[in-house]
C-alpha cells in the first residue's frame, strides 16, 4: 500500500493499533498469556519432576501456548508503539518522513494479516500433528495414478513448509499409482493448515493409459485428522477391534520388510480401518495404528457433536466430508480451482509441485 500523506499515515497507524488490540481481546490472548506465565512458573518448580506424567503435561501445554503466542509477542510492541513513532518522525521530518514510515507500516500490516490467519486456528487440535490419508475413488488405474500424484504434491508441500512427514502406510496400485496412502505430518499448526484439504479432489485430463487419448475425470478423497494426546480419554474396547498382521506391501527394495510386521486395525462398530507398516517393529506399527484409530474416533465424536448442535440451532451444513472441494483441469485448459473459496490458478505445474499454500490460506480466511 502506498501512503500518500502524513494525515493518512496517522490514520492508518491508529487503525492498525486498534485492529491489533481488538483481535487480541477477541481471541482471549491476555488469558492465554496469564496461563503461559502460570505454566512457566510450574515448569521451573524442581518438585514438578517428582511426578513425570504431570511434568510432561505441563511441558506440553506450555509448548503449545508458546507456539500460539510467540508470533503475537514478536510483533506486539512494534504495532502498539507505531502511532507514537509516526508522530515523532512526522514532527521531526514532516512529509519527508512519510516514505520510510510507509514501508514499516506495510511490513507491520503484512505481519498482522498473517497473525489473523493464525487466529483462525483457535481450536486446540489445530496445533497438533496430523494424519493425512489419500484414497482413490472408482476408476482403477486412472484414479490410482491421480492418488499418487496427490501424494507427491503433498510431500513437496511439506518439504517447502518445513514439516516433517513419514509415509506410515501405502498400498501399491494395479500396475500404476496407489490404492491407499497415509502420512504422519509434524510441524507448527500441522492439522490447522491441512484440515481444509478434507474432501474430494477431481482431476480432468487426457489419460496416459487410454490408447484413444480420451479425456478422463478421476476422483480421490483426502482425509485429515489430528493426532490426539494421551490425556484425551478415547475408550477403545478390545472386543470392538480386530487386529491383523501382514507383510509390508511397499515399493520394495533392500529395506522391504520380510516379516509380518505391518498392522491393520478394524474398529467394527464404526467401520474405521487404519494401518501402519513403516516400522520394522510390529509393536511400533501397532502403537501408531492405535494413535490413528484414536484420532479418527475423536474426530467422529466431534462430528456427531457438531451435527447435534446444527440440528438444535437449525443450521444446515454447506460442505460435507464427501464434498468435492477442488478441481485440477489439465485439458482442454490448465486450471486449478477451489470450489469453496473460488481461489484459482492456471499454473497447474506449480500446484502439483506443492505450491498449495495460497489455496490453504484462502480457505483459512473463510473460517
UniProtKB/Swiss-Prot annotation:
MF term (GO), any: translation release factor activity, codon specific
Keywords: Cytoplasm, Methylation, Protein biosynthesis
Main subcellular localisation: cytoplasm
Alphabetical list of SMART domains matching this protein: PCRF (SM00937)
Cellular component annotations (GO), alphabetically ordered: cytoplasm
Compartments where located: Cytoplasm
One Pfam family linked to the record: PCRF
Gene3D superfamilies tied to this protein: 3.30.160.20, 3.30.70.1660, Release factor
Post-translational modification: Methylated by PrmC. Methylation increases the termination efficiency of RF2.
Domain of life: Bacteria
Residues annotated with N5-methylglutamine modification: 254
Residue stretches spanning the membrane: none
NCBIfam families linked: prfB
Role: Peptide chain release factor 2 directs the termination of translation in response to the peptide chain termination codons UGA and UAA.
Family: Belongs to the prokaryotic/mitochondrial release factor family.
UniProt-recorded name of the protein: Peptide chain release factor 2
